[in-house]
Amino acid sequence: MRYLVTAALFALLLLPGRSSGVERSRYFLRLQDTLLRAQDSLVAKTADSLAVNDTVPALDSAAQAALADSLRRQHVYDSLDHIFWTQIDTTTLPCFDSLSVAWADSIAQFLPDTHDIKRLVRKMRKEERDSLKAAKPRVMETWVLPDSMYFRRILVWTSDKKFNEPTLGGLDTTANSNYNEYPMYKKDVGASYLGPVGSATQYFNYFKREEVPDAPMFTPYIGDSYTDENIPQYNTKTPYTELAYWGTPFANKKSEESNLKLISTQNITPSFNFTLGYQRLGSRGMLTNEDTDHRTTMIIGNYMGKRYFANFGTIRQRIVRNENGGVQDAFWIRDTSVEAKSIEVNLTSASNTYKRRQWFIHQTLAVPMNFFRKDRDSLALGEGTMAHLGHSGEFTTYSKVYADAIGTDDTFGRAFYHNQFYLDQTTSSDELMVRNFENRFFIKLQPFAPDAILAKINAGIGYQILATYSFQPLDYLTGRRYDTQHNLYVYGGASGQLKKYLAWDADADYYYAGYKMFDFDINGKLRLSVYPFDGGIHLTGKVHTGLQTPHPFEQQLYMNHHQWKNDFSKVSKSTLEAELSIPKWRLDAAFGYALVTNMLYYDTLAVIRQHDAPVNVMSVSLHKDFTLWRLHFDNRVLLQLSSAPEVLPLPKAAVNLRWYFDLDVVKDVMNVQIGVNAVANTRWYAPAFSPDIGQFHLQTSEKYGNIPYCDIFANVQWKRASIFLKYTNAFYDSWDRPQYFSAYHYIKPVSGIKFGIHWPFYTW
């Protein structure tokens, strides 16, 4: 500090206008010498001046005093003044002007003070900091990821709400990934759905069916949207944008399908990312009165710092759908070639509006516990003994509004609901609402290292406020009333790994107070990996067991077409799953077994029931891509068995075969796949759908299956853009009795041309 102040003072003394007293004296002497030389050039009158001898005699003190007095006399000053001013002419004026300018420009006006010195010191310090900041690269530093991943151009992950643990994923923008325009076909071999894209869906594979425990009416729609636990989070070095469109732009406006997806993500700093997303799935449908508009909007962000890691955002899901209840008679689909729009449907004036709004945050603060280490400053981020303090918060609102108008002379409409009209004989307006406010606080201890065999020990506590609303007759007197449940629970877990060969984790929840008292959930996972070749062989095992209290809507409901009041027991569910993955061979296999006691289901009248006997489910699936020269045989097969098909019907077999010829039109520029895609399943009692409660339910009237649904396609990878062109349901007229039903009395899209493009934009 002393040397810095000295340097600043020295710099101030050298600056123009900041000269020292010594320097100022030097300037004054130069000016005086110049003035004297200018005055010596003036001619003095002899009479007014003293005669000066060539030799000056020595004077005594009296003579010196007399001389001094003579010089001080007024007439001497007046004489010199007269001489000076009378001798100024145009040649001497520029001399005075230049001298005055030089003096004003070069002579210090004032000396530097303490404030000047401090100001210069601050300036020098700022310049030093700016130079260091400019020289330092902007690199993400975090304990969440190993330093080998800091320099990846883009990172994608999801985080769980229990412990805010990130699960890294990939970003696949290839033509193979974007070929399936229906989200359900990306996750499963097949599914039951209501025809248009974005409508209610139920997967064939029992082990891939998703649920919304807090709002059961959203279960058929959650697979086409995002939640706080499966929404992708990004960290990218340069801005990244995805634009996608797929649909039937050449179809009739009455049955047009139009889908859109937009994602734009950018890092504001190396640690902070901001993402905007929008997705629209929808179609006017093949039948009358089945317009579907399914939209999801996302505003999310994340911060991945040295000690702080957070994922946060808001998700808005909205579905507006006209409900037709399916065709009145399947004869018009199987045995005729009548235009689909002219076929009569069960409901002519019915609709559903679903809304879900979710705000969430998952955050963790890392605290290194190395207080007694002398070299703790050199300790790598995330290494050694650490504690992680975390919080997970969520506020979600769900709503469903169903409305219909069924006249007294509408035979098919009234028969569709089995002539059940409890509140009004002609119109319905039923509303279901749920509000979920939940907070979790947890601590994660890292005893040794993030890659140790015992890497983390976790514990937490949670509090949930669940408010539900459904109409009750008492509301006529009291108005709308929410039924509120409070739930308190504790949870914990542990995880670890052994290099890259073994990884394990386990967690458990237990509700000790509230509506869900004595509910529990236990999960375990073990992954073994060996590497005899590139990509390795990976075997994963999962185990789950739990006890769950039925939702308030499952216990009691009062609507115009359905009502019940139950006292169901807790549902017990245990599963065992195994997965095998060999990337080099493009092979994936899975096995699943489930045992469910007190299973809930909806009977043929769409009334909820509880099965009093255990139900066993077994499933085997295989995905293998065979290659023969340029021919690809991409096959997915699913086999399933249910011990109680009268309660849980499942297709015994389902396949998805995509066979194509792969051709490089221009190497590393354009690749084209030309082939056929077929989906099929064995005959089974496909479920029916009840629009007012928003649930799939049993039907035993008719079986569907054994007829493949085929698309002829051209799939193109043109640099970054992936483009497909399909002729859907190409063999619609090739079968004697086509049964292209997606669910009971709901049909799949008929023949038509579909076009899609997916284009990512980025620079790296």
Regions found by a protein language model. Name each.
Residues V5-T6, R26, S619, D634:
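Generic early N-terminus positional signal peaking at residue ~5-7
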Residues G21-R357, A366-G382, R527, Y531, ...:
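Membrane-proximal, glycine/serine-rich, low-complexity loop/turn segments characteristic
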